[in-house]
Amino acid sequence: MSKRTIQLNCDMGESFGVWTMGADEEVMPWIDMANIACGFHASDPHVMSRTIDLALEHEVMIGAHPSYPDLQGFGRRSLAMNEQEVSEIILYQVGALKALCESKNGQLSYVKPHGALYNDMMSDPSIFRAVVDAVSCFNLPLMVLASANNQDYLDIADRFDVPLLFEAFADRTYLANGKLTPRSQPNAVLSSEEAILNQVRQIARYGKVTSSDGFVIPIEADTLCVHGDNPNAVSLIARIRAALDE
C-alpha cells in the first residue's frame, strides 16, 4: 500500500523569559507545522514573536497552541471550566498569536490545543464544542486526535463550519480504544527510536497503529506530531522525516 502524505507538526515556543525549553532553532527546518505556545502553559510575548520569526524564516505553517491557564503545571492539569470560560481562554490566546503574526505579515493557519485541554476536548463533547465555537471566530482549522471513529467530532465541527486536521503521534503509545496512553501511566511515551520509526511507517503506509496491548487500530492522519524537547530530538526528527520520504 502506498504511503499517505503526512506533514510533521511540533510544539514550539515553549520557553519563558530566561528559561529555555526545546531546541526550536534546530528543529524548525525539519517540520512543516509549528504549534506555538500562547502564554498560558509556556511562552511570553517575546518568545511568541521570536518563534513566529523562526517559522516565517523556514516557511513553516504557524498554528496557535492554547492551553488551560496553568504555567506551573505546564498545561498538563485539567481545570474545571464551563463552556464559556473555555471559549474565552481560546479566543484570548489565539487572538494574541494572530495579532503577532499579522504584525509580521505572517498568517495563522490552524489551532491545536495543548496538554490537558487537548485531552479533555477529545473526551468531553461540551469542551470540544466550546473549543470549536471559539476557533470558528477565526475561520481556521482545528487539529484533533485521529481515531478509529472521527465522525462524532466531524458532526460537531460541521455545525460551526470548522475544518478538522487529524493528527497521530510518532512517540506516544495508544490504548485499545484509540486514545493516547495518559502520561501518568507507565510506557506512555515510546523510548526506542526504532519503535518510534516503526510506528511512523505503520501510520504513514498503512493508516494503522498498534496499541500497547497489541490491538491494530485504523487511523487516517493528516499530520504527525513529533516532540522537540528531548536530547536527541533533532536527529530523531530527521530520521522521522527520512522515514516519511522513503
Swiss-Prot record:
Gene3D superfamilies: Glycoside hydrolase/deacetylase (3.20.20.370). It comes from the Bacteria. Keywords: ATP-binding, Hydrolase, Nucleotide-binding. Its EC number is 3.5.2.9. The keyword Hydrolase applies. It is an enzyme of class 3 (hydrolase). Pfam families: LamB_YcsF. It catalyses: 5-oxo-L-proline + ATP + 2 H2O = L-glutamate + ADP + phosphate + H(+). GO terms for molecular function: 5-oxoprolinase (ATP-hydrolyzing) activity; ATP binding. CDD domains: LamB_YcsF_like. GO terms for biological process: carbohydrate metabolic process. Catalyzes the cleavage of 5-oxoproline to form L-glutamate coupled to the hydrolysis of ATP to ADP and inorganic phosphate. Belongs to the LamB/PxpA family. Forms a complex composed of PxpA, PxpB and PxpC. This is 5-oxoprolinase subunit A. It comes from Vibrio cholerae serotype O1 (strain ATCC 39315 / El Tor Inaba N16961).
